[in-house]
């Protein structure tokens, strides 16, 4: 069991390792992007709130996937405006809640999709590849290094 005084530092270490690996894959290997800003918040969730439903693999993967798709869709049919940005985030939040795949960091993905004007390729890299890597690393670090019962359930 990790002591209460050490736990914040352990959580930070876990989150930092995940982001460092995703950064390495993005910047040091010719594989494409594996990292987006919202993964920083995801790393916080899987280490600080690892027992929460929001931190479970299904929510991470499907929340990010659904939210980026919503952002790309809205970006393709509406011009960038306060209305389109609000609609994209609101729709992503509603759909995550409806399908019980809420992952709060993923609510930023529609904004990323619209402001960066991403293509459909963004779905595979970084969303699918990065989410799966984040999930696998979080599992390995939480389960085997920190001896935590993570995840509660896979799907």
Model feature map: region roles:
Residues 1-65, 69, 73, 77-86, ...:
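Alpha-helical transmembrane segments and their membrane-interface boundaries
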Residues 34-49, 89-119:
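Pore- and pathway-forming membrane helices of multi-pass small-molecule/ion transporters and channels
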């Amino acid at each position: 069991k990790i002591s209460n005084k050490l736990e914040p530092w352990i959580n930070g270490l876990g989150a930092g390792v995940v982001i460092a690996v995703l950064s390495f894959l993005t910047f040091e290997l010719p594989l494409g992007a594996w990292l987006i800003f919202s993964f920083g918040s995801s790393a916080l969730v899987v280490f600080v709130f690892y027992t929460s439903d929001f931190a479970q693999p299904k929510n991470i993967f499907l929340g990010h996937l659904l939210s980026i798709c919503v952002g790309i869709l809205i970006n393709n049919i509406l011009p960038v405006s306060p209305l389109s940005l609000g609609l994209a985030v609101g729709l992503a939040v509603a759909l995550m809640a409806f399908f019980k795949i809420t992952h709060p960091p993923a609510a930023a993905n529609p904004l990323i999709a619209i402001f960066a004007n991403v293509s459909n390729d963004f779905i595979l890299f970084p969303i699918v590849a990065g989410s799966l890597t984040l999930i696998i690393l979080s599992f390995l670090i939480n389960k085997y290094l920190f001896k935590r019962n993570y995840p509660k359930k896979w799907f």
